[in-house]
């Protein structure tokens, strides 16, 4: 059982980006959406908080789901380097970079083949379900050369 709503005032950082009482979870249910090599940890949830703070780690060569939803995210890169897409903007990301994901923006994170990409993600506790892109959405996104290269894993 995850203690992400654990009321202990201190939980020290452990090696490998782990914290005591916090379960290492699958990013999403297999087959629910396309992604590769991603884990999730819910660090803070409940106990009067209206948001959640989660740590995601994208393994080497992996990527999060390309999705959008009504709610916004705030992200801070903690580990490794990679690339992120928000809307039609693609950027290299590195530790301590901040990424703002407005509502209804297509977004995805990708790790390079040789290292993992880890990040904190702050989000509302109550939120809508993500939407996956349709073929028409993908065609619109791929009309931008930088976005097409990113989606093909060629960014950077």
Curated annotation (Swiss-Prot):
Domain Cupin type-2: 55-122
Binding residues for Mn(2+): 67, 69, 73, 107
Pfam families attached to this UniProt entry: Cupin_2
Gene Ontology MF annotations: lyase activity; metal ion binding; transferase activity
Record carries keyword DNA-binding: no
Active site as annotated: 121
Keyword field: Amino-acid biosynthesis, Lyase, Manganese, Metal-binding, Methionine biosynthesis, Transferase
Catalytic activities: S-methyl-1-thio-D-xylulose 5-phosphate + glutathione = S-(methylsulfanyl)glutathione + 1-deoxy-D-xylulose 5-phosphate; S-(methylsulfanyl)glutathione + AH2 = methanethiol + glutathione + A
Name of the protein in its database record: 1-methylthio-D-xylulose 5-phosphate methylsulfurylase
Record lineage: Bacteria, Pseudomonadati, Pseudomonadota, Alphaproteobacteria, Rhodospirillales
Gene name of the record: cupin
């Amino acid at each position: 059982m995850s203690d992400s709503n654990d009321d202990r005032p201190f939980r020290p950082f452990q090696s490998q980006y782990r914290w005591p009482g916090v379960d290492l979870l699958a990013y999403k249910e297999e087959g629910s959406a396309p992604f590769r090599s991603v884990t999730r940890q819910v660090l803070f949830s409940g106990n009067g908080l209206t948001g959640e703070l989660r740590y995601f780690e994208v393994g080497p060569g992996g990527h999060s789901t390309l999705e959008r939803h009504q709610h916004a995210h705030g992200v801070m890169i903690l580990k490794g380097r990679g690339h992120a897409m928000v809307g039609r903007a693609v950027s290299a990301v590195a530790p301590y970079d901040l990424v703002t994901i407005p509502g209804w923006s297509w977004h995805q994170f990708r790790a390079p083949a040789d290292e993992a990409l880890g990040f904190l993600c702050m989000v509302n506790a109550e939120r809508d379900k993500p939407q996956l892109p349709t073929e028409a959405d993908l065609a619109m996104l791929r009309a931008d050369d930088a976005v097409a290269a990113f989606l093909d894993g060629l960014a950077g």
